[in-house]
UniProtKB/Swiss-Prot annotation:
Intrachain S-S bonds: 42-181, 76-121, 109-126, 222-329, 288-310, 631-652, 699-710
The protein's name in its UniProt record: Peptidyl-glycine alpha-amidating monooxygenase
Record-listed a protein binding positions: 530, 651, 703
Organism of derivation: Bos taurus (Bovine)
Peptidyl-alpha-hydroxyglycine alpha-amidating lyase, as annotated region: 495-817
Amino acid sequence: MAGFRSLLVLLLVFPSGCVGFRSPLSVFKRFKETTRSFSNECLGTTRPVIPIDSSDFALDIRMPGVTPKQSDTYFCMSVRLPMDEEAFVIDFKPRASMDTVHHMLLFGCNMPASTGNYWFCDEGTCTDKANILYAWARNAPPTRLPKGVGFRVGGETGSKYFVLQVHYGDISAFRDNHKDCSGVSLHLTRLPQPLIAGMYLMMSVDTVIPPGGKVVNSDISCHYKKYPMHVFAYRVHTHHLGKVVSGYRVRNGQWTLIGRQSPQLPQAFYPVEHPVDVSFGDILAARCVFTGEGRTEVTHIGGTSSDEMCNLYIMYYMEAKHAVSFMTCTQNVAPDIFRTIPPEANIPIPVKSDMVMMHGHHKETENKDKTSLLQQPKREEEGVLEQGDFYSLLSKLLGEREDVVHVHKYNPTEKAESESDLVAEIANVVQKKDLGRSDTRESAEQERGNAILVRDRIHKFHRLVSTLRPAESRVLSLQQPLPGEGTWEPEHTGDFHVEEALDWPGVYLLPGQVSGVALDPQNNLVIFHRGDHVWDGNSFDSKFVYQQRGLGPIEEDTILVIDPNNAAVLQSSGKNLFYLPHGLSIDKDGNYWVTDVALHQVFKLDPKSKEGPLLTLGRSMQPGSDQNHFCQPTDVAVDPDTGTIYVSDGYCNSRLVQFSPSGKFITQWGEASLESSPKPGQFRVPHSLALVPPLGQLCVADRENGRIQCFKTDTKEFVREIKHPSFGRNVFAISYIPGLLFAVNGKPYFEDQEPVQGFVMNFSSGEIIDVFKPVRKHFDMPHDIAASEDGTVYVGDAHTNTVWKFTSTEKMEHRSVKKAGIEVQEIKESEAVVETKMENKPASSELQKIQEKQKLVKEPGSGVPAVLITTLLVIPVVVLLAIALFIRWKKSRAFGDSERKLEASSGRVLGRLRGKGGGGLNLGNFFASRKGYSRKGFDRLSTEGSDQEKDEDASESEEEYSAPPPAPAPSS
């Protein structure tokens, strides 16, 4: 009886425990997608804190279901840090829709201005020091912290509360009175971070702008006198008259761009395009360009909409032991250096009228004494503060204190009479200006109106995994090599090398974000791009539902057929069909297979038909993980022999799905990887597919795991992994041609040295035999790659909106292989011999020997392999010697038989050299059968060639054509 009572108690207790239980996978996905439970109209508020592991947790900070009643409403709410000890914010995930929210600011402080669920921000943000940790603006990319970088919170000096401020601009989206739960999800860790984030504020305080069209430059410069800081993001800020704001590091007279942006575009933090480090003795310089057009009076620096501001916020990190959390620069200590400022700093960035950000500031008060505005400080040009002061001055960037009234309230009676007073005045001006930005819901037209401007200057990155690179002390230009360039030169075997085709004009096409490239049966290049649509942090909600449906489909042709020689557009299609194009592949019949991550669908298109898709897989705008749904599918591969369809499904589901040629679901495999050392068959964004028909394999670019996985198409059995340290942490795309595998990686993470580049690999061994980069422009996010069988390679970049063409430096006819014809077998077999030798000797020494042999044997301009030349010279000599011996040895009566045998024998040899003949000498099999040589690692030479009839048995064929076992994953 006692046992029964115990069991009853357990049953009563356990259900509640089961409700709260979450598997590690669900916790991971929950943080990735959302950290709150949604119900009815709005996100719930039941579980703001979600454990990730023993040291990390997610904190969800969201509005508790609010409905603004008038435009330009600012709501604030607070969440207490769920711990007293020190922690570090290492990532931010915005949870806002551009249709409802204009911008969001996240502050840290020790006492919020109110203890209610939410309040009007007119009441203030915090009653003590407030620091800005995060800023999000519509149509702008989210702020990302590099790996190892964190903002300090908690502990003795850090903030105890987070305060979220949300600005609702145009409230027409709330006509249905729905509730809004916009906010931000934080990823925090208890582990000390080696690098601490901070802010450097450059601000002009004495600029005077006369009325009229005269250009006025407001210059700021300071000597940097601290430990090195590494810049990774920036934000510009002016009012209506600002045309462009530019920031630079000046070292030994050399100007290095930190950031340049129009202040009339969304004023969030943007990543620096190239890493910049600032060391002791450098000069930091900034210029704001103004005109007084439309004004009838002189304009000064101040806090109302009639005044102006010139601010550049530089977000940086420093080593923890030397970290200074906040620094300021408010003077121009080196005015002479601006004589050599790059001309770009003086060129306004044009912004269409429908793209201008409206600034809803308080109008100038009638009794305002303009002469009492901020005056030139009489302090050291650069102030450095410790942790506590950092929070005080960070609040001045965009925050509020208890005495702050909504939007740019400026008290002219409070003159700056001392250094501390001046800094306080600056703080009030900065924080209150940003509270006043308003919105007129022009978002849909902003991107559409000037696509190139938005794409090139705002959306320089596409997904959160595109982390920022380490800062380096160099000036980068389009023609200069990137960090780490050329480090793979010793690995070039000379066997295959590609270089950019500098005479190809296609690099200047500049379509939208290039998501896919492929080659049609006529060898024309086909580009799949996003037009004026972009994929950024605002595109999807936490459940992967597309949030910008109101923009409508892309109103321009998204599929371009390009002449491979002169880059002329031969054909275009795909208008008003897609929202966010992603993958593109072309089957043997020339049909296009495309994916759209917003629609969560796969389409089969006939390029010659205008009747719509031939086949559609998935449900429009409905993410899911069953047999009838996808969730942001990335790529498609179609088996040329069977017509079987393979889909990589993709960003959310981490699986591969197989369909019949008619679109019937067959099977799926794969799962999400949560560990640092993922297992075979686990994925973190299966991003690109490449079929290897001769071997019956499907290879997958496992993007976020930085590797390539190959599987058998019939059994789905894992075959091998290809992973190299030079890949870095991402492999975005792959392409296969007989014997070779091409790939492109992604932008390196913080402290990683691997550059963004393309790779050529021996498919059998997986060894890298060449790397390549463009000369014109540079890779930023190479998103897809396509290779033709003559060795021409095309790479499309989603950030630079560029397509490059690379060609082989060899005579490609010696490596050409026809899809449905006779191959030049002797070339393939000679390569097989070389590959076999390379497997049996150390790679480095063997590569040297191969290079030396090729140098000795090759004549200038010749690409003929040494083995081929030797074969062509030796065989006729052997045949002639054999004939002479037979003539001398045989009598005249036996001569006829000998002649017939010789004729048959020589016919087989010469026939083999022509790639014909059903039997005879097979150099690959001959050498592979000799002691000391292994057949393992050979490529299947052809599916149509006569060699296939010579396979002795199934087991031997399997050994010859299976890939080697996966090598141990390198530590990272």
